[in-house]
């Protein structure tokens, strides 16, 4: 398939799929049968990652003005971005947060070299030990986080350890490949749970005339995303705080999943868990004929209650379903999930 054109020559992964499950429509509250395929990604031999560039350190003078968004959107060219052990990820996060706060204090927009540093922030999925005062091996990291983050930032970071599944470049490429096969080329693109914006960073060349809109609840991730993608319209807040009905041509991303709900007055009556809420709202945000391409929990299809599936089927046509490998998020988010 066609993938993001990269600045460096790197071997392209082999992406194939095979049917693994069939959900009969008459047993699942659907007007049609659903065939789920399993995605196989055969990665080329990895090349050693380049060391992170040193960040230019701006002056520390206080400046309450917002940074001028005059930079260029960042482009991800590292297929192994976000991989590594817990200590490596922790240090990359800390380095990115320190740089973010320096840029904000100086009222500056990140340079391309600084964007490289910020892009290595992977969030706190799989790093719960750093927030646990009862873990002696992580005592210094615990103290460092308490000192570096505001109470609001700390609370958001700690809560994200359970549901922050940052998406690997390989999975993002496969999703864009599928969207491209559907005929999408350019338009208004929404990423409603963007993290630091890896889907924006891997936008294929043929889609680069699109207008980008992102939403991110976590304050640190959202502010890093603004530094990485200054030409995008990014809201740092919950998806429930935004509403652009019938505006987007494509909604894409890796939505949160879990057994809890979002307080959105327009959707509370549905009583949907968070991952299904994102589907329901996104369908209203895209225009008729638009596409929603999300990574979601397998329970969207596997749940015994067919209410969600019937709701979605009444409002949209399912174009395809892919089951990702169990370890699709292991290298980046430190988690094994079925999605």
Where are these regions (language model features)?
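A short acidic, Gly/Pro-enriched loop at the edge of an enzyme's catalytic core
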Residues: 242-252
């Amino acid at each position: 398939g066609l993938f993001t054109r990269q600045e460096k020559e790197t071997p392209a992964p082999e992406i194939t799929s095979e049917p693994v499950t069939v959900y009969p429509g008459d047993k699942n509250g659907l007007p049609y049968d659903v065939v789920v395929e399993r995605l196989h990604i055969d990665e080329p031999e990895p090349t050693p990652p380049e060391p992170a560039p040193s960040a230019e350190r701006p002056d520390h003078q206080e400046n309450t003005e917002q940074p001028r968004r005059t930079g260029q959107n960042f482009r991800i060219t590292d297929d192994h971005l976000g991989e590594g052990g817990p200590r490596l990820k922790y240090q990359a996060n800390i380095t990115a947060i320190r740089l973010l706060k320096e840029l904000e204090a100086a009222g500056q927009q990140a340079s391309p070299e600084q964007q490289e540093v910020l892009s290595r922030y992977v969030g706190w999925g799989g790093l719960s030990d750093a927030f646990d005062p009862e873990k002696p091996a992580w005592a210094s990291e615990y103290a460092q986080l308490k000192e570096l983050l505001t109470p609001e930032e700390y609370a958001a970071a700690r809560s994200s350890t359970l549901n922050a599944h940052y998406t690997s470049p390989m999975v993002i490429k496969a999703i864009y490949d599928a969207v491209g096969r559907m005929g999408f080329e350019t338009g208004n693109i929404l990423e409603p749970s963007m993290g630091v914006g890896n889907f924006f960073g891997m936008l294929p060349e043929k889609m680069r005339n699109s207008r980008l809109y992102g939403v991110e609840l976590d304050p640190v991730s959202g502010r890093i995303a603004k530094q990485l993608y200054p030409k995008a319209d990014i809201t740092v807040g919950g998806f429930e705080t935004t509403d652009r009905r019938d505006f987007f041509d494509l909604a894409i991303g890796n939505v949160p999943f879990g057994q809890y709900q979002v307080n959105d007055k327009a959707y509370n009556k549905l009583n949907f868990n968070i991952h299904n809420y994102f589907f329901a709202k996104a369908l209203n945000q895209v225009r008729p004929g638009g596409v929603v391409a999300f990574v979601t929990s397998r329970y969207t299809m596997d749940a015994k209650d067919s209410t969600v599936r019937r709701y979605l089927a009444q409002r949209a046509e399912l174009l395809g379903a892919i089951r990702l490998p169990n370890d699709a998020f292991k290298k980046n988010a430190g988690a094994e999930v079925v999605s």
